[in-house]
């Protein structure tokens, strides 16, 4: 069969499978492609094709991730599945695979397990906004009451991490049956039901271009007779010539007006998300603005120094530290375009952090940086990446 060309007319959503080892994440991923391939909406990917995912490098961290794509009547999906638990942790923290929603796979025979909890916590910390549950291996549980208890337990667990446990769709089924071609209630029908739940429960993400304007400053030039130009890649939103913007981070926030936008030496009316632009700024001196600051829509982002974060610390093999670090550790935090020194505070009861750990920390930066929740950063020592993190909440 020739590769079907995916129509880009449908809205695009990024999702992934999460959950405890051996609860059936990869089998479910394969089953979704199998069932949708039957409707001409996917290319079937066998379990082994997904399980032997190639390794990718994201910010110097090696992550094994499988990517599959498929579509429903309503949408086009990109779906990520990771073979190992450590890969999930790294993936979610680095944002290598940004998820608009996740399918939490729980084995009906076992109920929630330690990694089920950890993945829900990570989803909460790194800002995966919506979760749909697939209660897998339901054919292995004969007792209807037992199934109801497991469902109740999952709902309580989700609620305890601030997800709306009572409202989250839980679909019972057997990924293996569906993969083997079973057309019954727990087989193919369960997969179709799951996709309907994903379609209706996970909302369409707000596209980068629809968010308030933000551009990290990469470089600054003076153009004699014209003024100061800040260059960078527009991270989100649109900036039009004549609009007011704020310069945020590192110093007191200042307002200015964009009097020109250029790209590839051509003058434009506006710069949009994804564009590499130079923005000419009115009344700004060369020394008023520097790399590491951002240009942003006024009032849309503020500078902060203290925040809570979820971080993954690289192993020695990944090029990270060879030794643990302790409370008061002072590395550099690389936000967008610049390194800022910060002091790490470990949670009470945590003595030290070993290479390969993922950990919740509080960070105090020595200079304020424009940030909001969900912002990713690298942890570096003298230019070498030793960790990756994401801002989970801002303190001050």
From Swiss-Prot:
<dbReference type="InterPro" id="IPR004160">
    <property type="entry name" value="Transl_elong_EFTu/EF1A_C"/>
</dbReference>
<keyword id="KW-0378">Hydrolase</keyword>
<feature type="binding site">
    <location>
        <position position="26"/>
    </location>
    <ligand>
        <name>Mg(2+)</name>
    </ligand>
</feature>
<dbReference type="GO" id="GO:0005525">
    <property type="term" value="F:GTP binding"/>
</dbReference>
<keyword id="KW-0547">Nucleotide-binding</keyword>
<dbReference type="InterPro" id="IPR027417">
    <property type="entry name" value="P-loop_NTPase"/>
</dbReference>
<dbReference type="Pfam" id="PF03144">
    <property type="entry name" value="GTP_EFTU_D2"/>
</dbReference>
<dbReference type="InterPro" id="IPR000795">
    <property type="entry name" value="T_Tr_GTP-bd_dom"/>
</dbReference>
<dbReference type="Pfam" id="PF03143">
    <property type="entry name" value="GTP_EFTU_D3"/>
</dbReference>
<feature type="region of interest" description="G5">
    <location>
        <begin position="174"/>
        <end position="176"/>
    </location>
</feature>
<feature type="domain" description="tr-type G">
    <location>
        <begin position="10"/>
        <end position="206"/>
    </location>
</feature>
<keyword id="KW-0460">Magnesium</keyword>
<dbReference type="InterPro" id="IPR009000">
    <property type="entry name" value="Transl_B-barrel_sf"/>
</dbReference>
<dbReference type="GO" id="GO:0005829">
    <property type="term" value="C:cytosol"/>
</dbReference>
<comment type="function">
    <text>GTP hydrolase that promotes the GTP-dependent binding of aminoacyl-tRNA to the A-site of ribosomes during protein biosynthesis.</text>
</comment>
<keyword id="KW-0648">Protein biosynthesis</keyword>
<dbReference type="InterPro" id="IPR033720">
    <property type="entry name" value="EFTU_2"/>
</dbReference>
<feature type="binding site">
    <location>
        <begin position="136"/>
        <end position="139"/>
    </location>
    <ligand>
        <name>GTP</name>
    </ligand>
</feature>
<protein>
    <recommendedName>
        <fullName>Elongation factor Tu</fullName>
        <ecNumber>3.6.5.3</ecNumber>
    </recommendedName>
</protein>
<keyword id="KW-0251">Elongation factor</keyword>
<dbReference type="InterPro" id="IPR041709">
    <property type="entry name" value="EF-Tu_GTP-bd"/>
</dbReference>
<feature type="binding site">
    <location>
        <begin position="19"/>
        <end position="26"/>
    </location>
    <ligand>
        <name>GTP</name>
    </ligand>
</feature>
<dbReference type="GO" id="GO:0003746">
    <property type="term" value="F:translation elongation factor activity"/>
</dbReference>
<feature type="region of interest" description="G2">
    <location>
        <begin position="60"/>
        <end position="64"/>
    </location>
</feature>
<keyword id="KW-0479">Metal-binding</keyword>
<feature type="region of interest" description="G1">
    <location>
        <begin position="19"/>
        <end position="26"/>
    </location>
</feature>
<keyword id="KW-0342">GTP-binding</keyword>
<dbReference type="InterPro" id="IPR004161">
    <property type="entry name" value="EFTu-like_2"/>
</dbReference>
<dbReference type="InterPro" id="IPR050055">
    <property type="entry name" value="EF-Tu_GTPase"/>
</dbReference>
<keyword id="KW-0963">Cytoplasm</keyword>
<dbReference type="GO" id="GO:0003924">
    <property type="term" value="F:GTPase activity"/>
</dbReference>
<feature type="binding site">
    <location>
        <begin position="81"/>
        <end position="85"/>
    </location>
    <ligand>
        <name>GTP</name>
    </ligand>
</feature>
<dbReference type="Pfam" id="PF00009">
    <property type="entry name" value="GTP_EFTU"/>
</dbReference>
<feature type="region of interest" description="G4">
    <location>
        <begin position="136"/>
        <end position="139"/>
    </location>
</feature>
<dbReference type="InterPro" id="IPR009001">
    <property type="entry name" value="Transl_elong_EF1A/Init_IF2_C"/>
</dbReference>
<dbReference type="InterPro" id="IPR031157">
    <property type="entry name" value="G_TR_CS"/>
</dbReference>
<feature type="region of interest" description="G3">
    <location>
        <begin position="81"/>
        <end position="84"/>
    </location>
</feature>
<dbReference type="InterPro" id="IPR004541">
    <property type="entry name" value="Transl_elong_EFTu/EF1A_bac/org"/>
</dbReference>
<comment type="similarity">
    <text>Belongs to the TRAFAC class translation factor GTPase superfamily. Classic translation factor GTPase family. EF-Tu/EF-1A subfamily.</text>
</comment>
<comment type="subunit">
    <text>Monomer.</text>
</comment>
<dbReference type="InterPro" id="IPR005225">
    <property type="entry name" value="Small_GTP-bd"/>
</dbReference>
